[in-house]
Amino acid sequence: MKFATKLSLGCIALLSCALGAAGLLLTGQSFSGSLASTRTALQAQQEKEKYALERIIFQATDSAQFENYILASAAQQYAEQTADAGSSMALWLDGAYTLYSGLPAALPRTALKQALTNGENAWQLTRAAGRWYLLLTQPLDLPGVRADMLCAYDVSAVFATRDAQLRAWLA
């Protein structure tokens, strides 16, 4: 081969690699932005859910004592009133005991415990049964009780969009 042909093929290969890398970078940035905006929206939603659950708990009792059955009943009542296919919740006591859980059974208990350990304003992605879940924890403001609201939001659509973009780019 002549030098000019080799140079042309080398430039084409280099340009192809550069365009491929740029496409993957743009797809990654798009995914990161989409996941961040979804997470922010879900954190705001969870904050509203926390206040609504606290209101139900305070309405369920006339005393400052919060019995476990009252907490569990209030959590179940709230979950039934606000049932949504893309989200579910659990109420944990002292970070160790589940008082109520409407979470998907496929979510591993170790992931749930880790989300509780991470605490407020932390988030965790977990994959279970072919779905991606964003786990968020909020402590409830109840006097004398350490109760946490753990929510699992199905964010599989964000990952499906990313996968479709990658397939389109690589096709």
Regions found by a protein language model. Give the residues of each.
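Helix-start (N-cap) segments at beta->loop->alpha junctions
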Residues: L140-V145, L150-W169
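Hydrophobic, aromatic-rich alpha-helical transmembrane segments
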Residues: A4, S8-I12, T161-L166, L170
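Extracellular/periplasmic ligand-sensing ectodomains of membrane signal-transduction proteins
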Residues: G86-Q114
